[in-house]
Amino acid sequence: MFKDFFNRTKKKKYLTVQDSKNNDVPAGIMTKCPKCKKIMYTKELAENLNVCFNCDHHIALTAYKRIEAISDEGSFTEFDKGMTSANPLDFPSYLEKIEKDQQKTGLKEAVVTGTAQLDGMKFGVAVMDSRFRMGSMGSVIGEKICRIIDYCTENRLPFILFSASGGARMQEGIISLMQMGKTSVSLKRHSDAGLLYISYLTHPTTGGVSASFASVGDINLSEPKALIGFAGRRVIEQTINEKLPDDFQTAEFLLEHGQLDKVVHRNDMRQTLSEILKIHQEVTK
């Protein structure tokens, strides 16, 4: 009896904890800042252009919300809305991933293009949306951007492009890489016509996008703390066998080293663009 008592297996006691992901932030009503973790009302955050009230972190804006923020009400006309990607390399499950992102975002591709007016001044615009395949650049992105640039050239309009991309889209291989040169040629024609191109880099702008149309603006702007670069930090450190500065590949680092003209807070975005367009309008009269 006593032998059995001492050999008896003790039952382990566990505390059951609910998954915090399920009840941390009410869906749709509240939004958590990805940087400081502060929880805010989604509506109030949207009114502040998705800039955190606590830490000033610039949370990503959707393409349509950004266009709304920089244009006169009702002035935006979208181009090539229905253009979608094919699967030229028969890459496994690529089309399924495209369809999933289309359902999630309501977009057909990772860029929205068209014309709009800001304080009565007409301009062409392209806005990348990183929710769709991380804004990766494929054939459709290249084609849509080239079409709006060519339209701006033919109609003598300034052009504003907001970049947000992880780079080239690997599922389209060399066709994706070709878009770097293709978009650059269209921008060269736009420049040769004496027209203004404003490149506005947002978080993140990397890879083939940073090495092509994002870096060749007549004026290059960026949002605070945006990640901007070509290769990843770890790859560079391993290649050169050196430790990089903590602020390497940030907008502020690029501004300090002459690769940006200005870092613009999102609340100043509309006013800054309006002032630049007014100057361009005056000198081209």
Swiss-Prot record:
Q: What is its EC number?
A: 2.1.3.15
PROSITE patterns according to UniProt = COA_CT_NTER
Outline the residue ranges of the record's C4-type zinc fingers: 33-55
Catalytic reaction list: N(6)-carboxybiotinyl-L-lysyl-[protein] + acetyl-CoA = N(6)-biotinyl-L-lysyl-[protein] + malonyl-CoA
Q: Which GO terms describe its cellular component?
A: acetyl-CoA carboxylase complex
What GO MF terms are annotated? acetyl-CoA carboxylase activity; ATP binding; carboxyl- or carbamoyltransferase activity; zinc ion binding
Is Ligase among this UniProt entry's keywords?
A: no
Kindly report, in one word, the top-level EC class recorded for this enzyme: transferase
Positions binding Zn(2+) in this chain are: 33, 36, 52, 55
Organism domain of life: Bacteria
**PANTHER family according to UniProt:** ACETYL-COENZYME A CARBOXYLASE CARBOXYL TRANSFERASE SUBUNIT BETA, CHLOROPLASTIC
Q: What else is known?
A: It is not known from which strain the crystal structure is derived.
According to UniProt, the name of this protein is Acetyl-coenzyme A carboxylase carboxyl transferase subunit beta
